[in-house]
Structure formats: structure tokens, C-alpha cells
Amino acid sequence: VVLLDNGRLKMLKDPQFREALTCLKCGTCLNVCPVFRELSGLIWGYVYVGGIGAIWTSFIHGFEKAAPLAFTCLLCGRCKSVCPMEIDIPVMVLKLRKMLIEAGYIPPPIESIAKNVEVYGNPYGAREKIE
């Protein structure tokens, strides 16, 4: 018998994310996810897709791999409203985002906006005044 932990013990010890262990991976959350509907899961990881996939990815492969997934979630809460285990996925994704930002990760689109404001005085990168 081979037992594969896949980050479960680490997740069990973390009260912020322990709830993710109750995920049945039934896909009910994906059926109502607007991001999944538009992107068909193509960019939502390979551990598992959706917001809960961002949490699992962070524990199995590290926060760096989970970063794009965490910032793709809209935090709309539709997943929570249909989850048979009543997992509060948006709250966990928000906690993951906070941890990523505290570790210095800034999503590329937000970093781009910040640079544009600094260099051009506007978020669009327009060189001339927009009226």
C-alpha cells in the first residue's frame, strides 16, 4: 500500500485552509463558476480546477504555482452557495491572495497598472492626457 500525502497533513495543521480537506471534488462548484464557464478550465491548473484548485495547488506545489489561479477567481461566492460540503472557497482564496501579496507576489495586470500610474500618471499607459 502506498499512501500519498499531497499536502494534506500540512493543510490539516493550517486552520485557515483545513476546510479544503472536506472537498469531495464533485465539480458542483465548477458548474456555477463564471470564470470556469468562460475559460473551460484551461488555465485553472492541473491539481484541481476552480478556486478550490488554487488552494490545493498552493499546498501541493507551493504558493508560486497557485498565484495565477488565486487571482483569477472572482470571489463571487457562487461556489459556496452550491457546495454540498458548504466550503467557503472565496474566503480561503482571499486568504491565499493575502499570503501571496505579503510574500511579494503582485499579479502582472496589477503590477502593470501601478507602473503606468507611476510613469504616465494614468492606469492605461497613455502618453497624452485622456479627456
Language-model-detected regions and their locations in the chain:
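Ferredoxin-like iron-sulfur electron-transfer modules
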Residues: 3-25, 53-75
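Residue-identity detector for glycine
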Residues: 7, 27, 41, 45, ...
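Iron-sulfur-cluster electron-transfer modules
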Residues: 60-131
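Short hydrophobic beta-strand segments
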Residues: 1-3, 131
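Iron-sulfur cluster-binding cysteine motifs and their immediate structural context
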Residues: 28-55, 72, 78-99
